[in-house]
A protein has these predicted regions:
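Acidic-basic catalytic patches of nuclease active cores, encompassing PD-(D/E)XK
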Residues: 1-50
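A short acidic (Asp/Glu
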Residues: 57, 81, 116-120
Length: 206
């Protein structure tokens, strides 16, 4: 059954019209418009070989400007507490994210929900740089229990249609990778180089 939902997400992110339209059938008009943005900026979505290999996630999502592994979870309850194998998967995603500078994601599908039934979460890592570092600020990380252990709460995730809007919009009103790079450059301290005349005057007065 889980492979069915993996395929559902894969069709949406890959910009496959037939599969995508079936998924968004019960979405609102606004949600459908955001979901369809991926048709113009689709991803190559590959099911990880031997899905479930430590740290690879279930899907590898690639495009010229971005790449991330996604672990797919499907439940009827809105919360999923990680333990045993699922906790091992999470720890492996953290390890590979730190080691490779990746931004691993969880995609959680809640059964029995109309509209956008997917929620996106980020696995917290400390090695993100550049555009991914800025993008990560927009995506909620997995919430934590009182003991500090990560878990999944569908209610606290980012709707898939909003995630697609962030990574697929092409104008400066949304942080696509090019726009994110511009923000990075803007946020960096600006160092003003003195003009030749200013430098000569400084040396003369010294």
């Amino acid at each position: 059954m889980s492979s069915q939902y993996e395929r559902e997400l894969r069709h949406v992110l890959a910009g496959i019209p037939a599969g995508g339209e079936a998924v968004i059938r019960s979405c609102s008009v606004e949600e459908k418009e955001r979901m369809r943005m991926v048709l113009k900026r689709p991803f190559l979505v590959v099911r990880a070989a031997g899905s479930g290999i430590e740290g690879s996630g279930d899907l590898l999502v690639l495009r010229g400007d971005i790449c991330f592994p996604i672990e797919v979870k499907t439940t009827r309850p809105s919360k999923l507490y990680l333990s045993g194998r699922t906790l091992d998967q999470y720890n492996a995603l953290v390890y590979e994210g730190e080691r490779c500078g990746l931004m691993p994601l969880y995609a959680h599908r809640l059964k029995g929900v109309r509209g956008d039934s997917w929620r996106i979460f980020r696995v917290e890592t400390t090695t993100l740089t550049g555009s991914l570092g800025v993008l990560a600020r927009r995506i909620p990380s997995l919430p934590r229990t009182r003991n500090g252990r990560a878990f999944i709460d569908w209610e606290q995730g980012m709707p898939l249609n909003e995630f697609i809007e962030i990574v697929c919009q092409q104008d400066a009103s949304s942080p696509t990778l090019g726009f994110l790079q511009g923000r990075i450059e803007f946020e960096q301290p600006q160092v003003t180089k003195p003009s030749v005349i200013e430098e000569l005057l400084r040396r003369r007065s010294a």
